[in-house]
């Protein structure tokens, strides 16, 4: 009993051994199999010596879960959560506990991946279809996206759409009304500058005085005014102007829809529907347009199709618009969006139903009426004559009001011109109105909420003009009218969850996606009120905990990347790419080299790379790769020399998208630098770098980091994500700034790329916890274990499938690519067949046909145990044996378990199944592991072509429920 030291006994709580899947004995067995003595020996065999770090990271020691929680609890306590009336797109909300516990805090929802495999994602696809239905009903338009990143970036996407579809082809002006939220205008201006658009800002009525391709209006505006735009929109549309509207989702419950006024595009934040402010995010933006603009929509769209049995099935529609297919010609670079938050918003609408939403919205509006009536009774002047939830007040002693507000622990909006704003929300109580009277008027005002309410009821309210009161029904679909009891809601959420395969069931080995453990201990702080309920524009001295957390996380990321500074603002990897390219662009401009606009991109690059380059106003020149998948150095030298005068940068991924450490990476950086360019190193594969090498050490100038890959933020079924960028010192002055929050950095006055100054700050505690708990040694060991797992899988599968690319010593990095093209030629079995057959074995498919068509790219991550790796390997070996039966003719090419996969309960219940040349057991219980823990796909293979030819992106018709 005394063999272990006290130090060893104290380490039982260390997170490291919980995060890494293989235990020490499993690791040794795997090392023996791949032919390495230790993790360090394997690392030396794989990572080129020239780029290997000689020093350890300086993060600190690994720690236990209890210690990590205690430390971050101390940070949380430094935040002062005042009652917020700031508004400006961020509002207090009540997260229904049934959604908090069963969605936000449920790994069945937050660990899933984007539904590229729809047969095992029907649950979240239905939830997102509900979100699209909510968006369409409230905006009065035809087609909604599955979510965008935030309201401000949605505005930039609306501007881009307007230019694409406007018939005013010669126009180059985008008009923005001067009463939109300032952060929205900031992001629009940043995007417009890249596109070469002119942005004109002025009173809404002046839009008709310009030759425009598009215009943007806020409904209700930043001051709270509600305007009937019907005549203005008609006049603009007669001039071929695309009319876009930023709308408040809660107000639309009561107000005439922008679509009914004639808008072409309506967007906004769904945050008010049960998603905490989170110091700026994450929140889902809704984006809705007329049907005629569907091919120009940004982001994912969920559509209805049918499966092989003719049953209704959901899928991602019209994917040919998106970056992973169209690359630099895509409508947008958006990849990860905000699916988890969109799910929360859709469930909020389902749980409350139309009547509940009307009650919530009416209560907010009634409190605004009461506040206005009391203030006006005391002679206070309002800027706005109409309102839903926001009052803008003039003529106050601002200093005195602010002092009383801070003493009462509340934050109001204080504009530069002396206007004071008050925005009410779902959390507002009667006592809050009393407190607001005290703060605005001082003590002794004599106002009584009940008396004011009685007066309003007796006289009626005129604050929403009669012409702007919504007359049409909303959310009449049965889904929004049957789950208002918590029992029914809980079961509905569970019913949808059970249709989806997430990390809580099995490994998701998607190459280039890094589906590692999202540990419970990392997730816990996210829903703490000290982090969840902070307004992003609150005084910074109230956010000392957030400030310290962001500073510590930034310093750790600087250490990990080898850069000099980090910008946290980008709220997705694609936005990080855009932000990094903007920094390069601004840097060249500062040196008088504005003409440098060519971006070199290897042909193997992620689709977001060329899409982001196009977004940043750059011209893409593609460079070749050799047969080993490496950048063709001779072609790079030739291209770099040809465009040297105008070379802006290269975008390159490391390790390469082919899953190997290119030996010539430093030479690649040198070639670009010699011709005056900068090196953008895509951080998608950072999970193979941390602690072993770094972008800065390699020679890159800027990278984005996918916190939702390398640093443990969950994918959420398609978001949230975070894409902060690391930069060398010469680029630091050119990273994103923010028009509202200026913490005193050299980059403060630069344009923003996201609505909030720190992006989706509410999920930063996840990555902070991940790094804090693992420490320097744990981070390095995680990377080394990722390499071990990948090489173990690669070597095992290489006995049955060709492995397409290998690096030094016949090794791969953190992922491997198996080549299915020879099998397809010999048997007719496709990569799609294998992907769907894996569903029958209880697995999500690896990445299909990227970066090479006809392949599968497998990334197991460090979190998977040898037991799980072996289960996946056994499935792939079994599938190879099935393919052999097709090759031999034992099974027909058009009637076999692969061609017919995935199999459902309906299949094995079908009497006609007996005509198939394989048994029911082979179909649905192909392995012993599946027999004891079966995941059932709920639909058969989905017909993608039918879905796009018969586009339907709303809930099922009522007849389906009759």
UniProtKB/Swiss-Prot annotation:
Keywords: Oxidoreductase, Pyridoxal phosphate. It is an enzyme of class 1 (oxidoreductase). One of its GO terms (cellular component) is glycine cleavage complex. The glycine cleavage system is composed of four proteins: P, T, L and H. PANTHER family: GLYCINE DEHYDROGENASE (DECARBOXYLATING), GLYCINE DEHYDROGENASE, DECARBOXYLATING. The glycine cleavage system catalyzes the degradation of glycine. The P protein binds the alpha-amino group of glycine through its pyridoxal phosphate cofactor; CO(2) is released and the remaining methylamine moiety is then transferred to the lipoamide cofactor of the H protein. This is Glycine dehydrogenase (decarboxylating).
